[in-house]
Amino acid sequence: MHDYAENRITIRRARIGDVREIKRLVDTYAGRVLLEKDLVTLYENVQEFWVAERTDREPKDIVACGALHVLWEDLGEVRTVAVDPRVRGRGVGHRLVNGLVELAAELGLPKLFVLTFETEFFAKHGFEPITGTPVSPAVYAEMRRSADKGVAEFLDLPYVKPNTLGNTRMLLRLDERT
């Protein structure tokens, strides 16, 4: 089953030329399990994205995307993970998230946050549901100054609640992994 993902998919950093394909993937799930993303937002954040590229045919095809966003000195967020329905269930999303987790470890981030409906998927990577806000009051006050929606979602601020209903806030503690 994962043979498909291993042999025909390359995980790599996104490039400017991938942004429209990332938008296509995000639009597949927008309004249901992902928040909509404007094209300009994707261009502004392309450096945070990684893609899964199908390499067994020409032209090569972007079949999944995901981003790692740094929220604080000890906290990152996995965001905007989308897998093309044609390859769902074949391990592509797992390979992509594994790559984002490895990148977070390389950056020295001890914790990773995700806001998701896909709790079983992320639980397989060690993410656990959280309640409250696992940061000190001083860090909370500093993070409140951010205009980033992901920070507001992590802090569970009231103004983002209408956009996050039904989602689960989950945390992976990389510093506790063996």
Provide a role label for each language-model segment.
Residues 83, 89-102, 113-114:
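Conserved acetyl-CoA-binding loop-helix of GNAT-fold acetyltransferases
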Residues 60-61, 122:
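Glycine-biased flexible loop/turn sites that connect beta-strands or occur in inter-domain linkers
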Residues 106, 110, 116-144:
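Conserved active-site alpha-helix within GNAT-family acetyltransferase domains
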